[in-house]
Amino acid sequence: MSGSYTPSPGGPFSALTASMWPQDILAKYTQKEQTVEQPEFRYDEFGFRVDKEDGAEPNSSKLLGIPLTEDPQQRLRWQAHLEFTHNHDVGDLTWDKIDVTLPHSDKLRSLVLAGIPHSMRPQLWMRLSGALQKKQNSEMTYKDIGRNSSNDDTLAAKQIEKDLLRTMPSNACFSNLQSVGVPRLRRVLRGLAWLFPDIGYCQGTGMVAACLLLFLEEEDAFWMMATIVEDLVPVSYFNTTLVGVQTDQRVLRHLIVQYLPRLDKLLQEHDIELSLITLHWFLTAFASVVHIKLLLRIWDFFFYQGSLVLFQTTLGMLKMKEEELIQSENSASIFNTLSDIPSQIEEADVLLREAMLISGTLTEVMIEAQRRKHLAYLIADQGQLLNSTAAVANLSKIMRRQSQRRKSAITTLLFGDDNFEALKSKNIKQTALVADLREAILQVARHFQYTDPKNCSIDLTPDYTMESHQRDHENYVSCSQSRRRRAKALLDFERHDDDELGFRKNDIITIISQKDEHCWVGELNGLRGWFPAKFVDILDERSKEYSVAGDDSVTEGITDLIRGTLSPSIKSIFEHGLKKPSLLGGPCHPWLFIEEAASREVERDFDSVYSRLVLCKTYRLDEDGKVLTPEELLYRGVQSVNVSHDAAHAQMDVKLRSLISIGLNEQVLHLWLEVLCSSLPTVEKWYQPWSFLRSPGWVQIKCELRVLSKFAFSLSPDWELPVKREDKEKKPLKEGVQDMLVKHHLFSWDIDG
């Protein structure tokens, strides 16, 4: 009987692919029409049961009241575009003559935003998403996958069986076990669970697959699902941890702060966890929350643009309801309004227009940068890095079941064997590197506590919470409440008169007055007096309090700990997964990566109308009163080391150790690591996918390094450089102040400042 009954245009089931027409129900419709009786149930063009007539009442839904129609002009525009871009052959243009992928262009984007003609959706969705190319390039056919996944005894198969009738119970194609769509949905979901064993079965995929089966043939629907899992959404979106979609909820929250600040303030005031509502929107790509007509328009753009559309659509929805949310009286009202937003959106054009207005400038690069950061934070927050470093490798790529075709010996020799055991050994190496770094940090911390007892109260436990990362920049911005300006004595100065301030080498003097260029007034041990300015060195205490334990000119042991223990452990982490040079040779050192990443990060501000030191970036001030971001500080540090060390022909190892010393002095070593790891193009260029810097593991290293920011270092970046000849020939310091001493006897000194 298949194909015997055809739905009437615009009538029930008319929008479905032909093979999904439920012949038993269509047969009843035909019989009812002949007997002039009302059918038992009414169905819309998508096969969903309609309980009552809709469209006549003033408050009726536009989506239900207006049938799905195809705009002839829009179809002509699509045909013209396809003919113009694929007019390689003379004659009628058919789908087999159109490329498997459609090159992105402004024209194509505008066409997609305006909507794809419904009759063209199956072919265009496959091409826009890349599913057709995936289908044609696959080593295994859908039949092979179906044959391998037909086992009823697997855990995934049993879970799928439980959910088959729960997925879309109000649709005639999935309402009972005899419905035409149920066996198709079973095979598609089993095939996905078999092809992606790391994911298995996720309930979120069921709703998406069922919607696709309404409009695409079974095999095409399967490859569309494979494309969504592998290409359109991030890794781990559908696995048991849902860490991918959880990460996107944090990214969404970040975007709301940027694009909808009033709504952000409202959510914070009422302590509403938005992800409780929106996670399901993302997991099902809106399939479970919006009307099918609206879903088709969202999916048109989703298959063209990818997961970026999920963010833009959500922001558009929230913007449309922002005023209503702000006027809500309490938390319960806000939560309910947020939950009801998707079901209240009725006009796709209005939604997409609002989405483009508020977030049209949002790009995939911006989203990926935030994803990388928040994924690392999320995993560190959950403690997974401490317990299972193997989980990190699984987040970099979805493992697809492959056909059993072995690599040749030459291929293995040239490109290596990235099997599970190899990844496992790399994860073991990661654990050892973290342990070495942690021990080096503890050695430095114990040195501070032993040498300078005031450090004994410092907590040495790393803080892995999400809040700790938010506080990092706040701590960086805020300077010490103590506004004292202090200096360290470079040599002994004996007191002869009552108005002189005597001190010994390395004493810490509080400066009272610097009015005179040569003679300053200071205080030490309750006594005030003048002293030669050249006899002291101003301490950098913008955000720290000087400690003798961290001064390499006073305490020799700190040099060995920093340059001999800590720096090598940090270098080992930067060397982990560093890509080796080609067979032709070439340098391969973390310093080269740091140089390039620092330059790339700071270049983003070069084209600004203002200087890259503009005050709108309210970070710490340097000695010239300019404002420096962590990126700028890193860039300056790298340039400073290059200038001083290149003149001495120093090796890159020495440069790296000196830069680490600068980072410790400025208490920004952990922030510099974040800057470097956030430079995605540079990291991907220099490091393997399994490396520490390309995995979420870097955030644990950041948390470990943050412990060092609790201590005050005064390290010389030039410690390993040879002493310059002019420095050797310089006159003793005391000889340089004879004129100043004469000046002391000629003038009176205002000791009280």
From Swiss-Prot:
Family, per entry: Belongs to the small G protein signaling modulator family.
GO terms of molecular function: GTPase activator activity; small GTPase binding
Species, as recorded: Xenopus laevis (African clawed frog)
Chain ranges of the RUN domain: 557-720
Taxonomy, superkingdom: Eukaryota
Domain Rab-GAP TBC, chain residue ranges per copy: 115-306
Alphabetic keyword roster: SH3 domain
Stated name of the protein: Small G protein signaling modulator 3 homolog
Entry-linked PANTHER family: RAB GTPASE-ACTIVATING PROTEIN 1-LIKE, RUN AND TBC1 DOMAIN-CONTAINING PROTEIN 3
Domain SH3: 482-541
